[in-house]
C-alpha cells in the first residue's frame, strides 16, 4: 500500500462512497453507505491526528497476529476501523442476533472477539466498549446472523458485553505459548 505524507478523506456525493486517498494513484473505498455515516458533508478532508492514531493502533494490533490466522489484511481493517470511528453513525445494540457467553467481565486489553449467531461465528475487532456495550467490526469475510440477515466484512455492530466470546486465534496463540514455555 503506497502512501503519501497526508492522507485525505474523500466523499463522492454522486456515488455515496467514502474513500481514503493514500497517494495520487491509490484510493481505498470503504464499504459504508451514506445512511451509516455522519458528518460527511465534504468532498475532501485531511485525516487528523486522531485518525492517524486509530489507524496505527489497529494496524499494530492486527499485525501482531500471524497473517495466516487473520481473514483480512491489517491495513484494510485499520482503514475501515478508522473510517468508522470518525464517521460511523451511532448504533442501537443488536445483541439478540447473538448467543450469550459465560464471561462476566471482558478484559479491556482484549481487542479481538468472536460472536456466535447460532447460524455462524465471526471474528471481530472491538472498536470501543463501555460498561455495557461493545462496538465490533467484522473481520471475517461475512457472517450469517439469521435466515434472512447477514453482515458483510468490515461492517459494524453494537452488542452487550455478555455476547463477546474469546477469539479462537487468541486462544490458539495462548495455548501455543504455554506449550512453548513447558517445553523450554
Curated annotation (Swiss-Prot):
<keyword id="KW-0132">Cell division</keyword>
<comment type="subunit">
    <text>Interacts directly with FtsZ.</text>
</comment>
<dbReference type="InterPro" id="IPR048373">
    <property type="entry name" value="ZapC_N"/>
</dbReference>
<keyword id="KW-0963">Cytoplasm</keyword>
<protein>
    <recommendedName>
        <fullName>Cell division protein ZapC</fullName>
    </recommendedName>
</protein>
<dbReference type="InterPro" id="IPR048372">
    <property type="entry name" value="ZapC_C"/>
</dbReference>
<dbReference type="Pfam" id="PF07126">
    <property type="entry name" value="ZapC_C"/>
</dbReference>
<keyword id="KW-0131">Cell cycle</keyword>
<dbReference type="GO" id="GO:0043093">
    <property type="term" value="P:FtsZ-dependent cytokinesis"/>
</dbReference>
<dbReference type="Pfam" id="PF21083">
    <property type="entry name" value="ZapC_N"/>
</dbReference>
<dbReference type="InterPro" id="IPR009809">
    <property type="entry name" value="ZapC"/>
</dbReference>
<comment type="function">
    <text>Contributes to the efficiency of the cell division process by stabilizing the polymeric form of the cell division protein FtsZ. Acts by promoting interactions between FtsZ protofilaments and suppressing the GTPase activity of FtsZ.</text>
</comment>
<dbReference type="GO" id="GO:0005737">
    <property type="term" value="C:cytoplasm"/>
</dbReference>
<dbReference type="GO" id="GO:0000917">
    <property type="term" value="P:division septum assembly"/>
</dbReference>
<comment type="similarity">
    <text>Belongs to the ZapC family.</text>
</comment>
<keyword id="KW-0717">Septation</keyword>
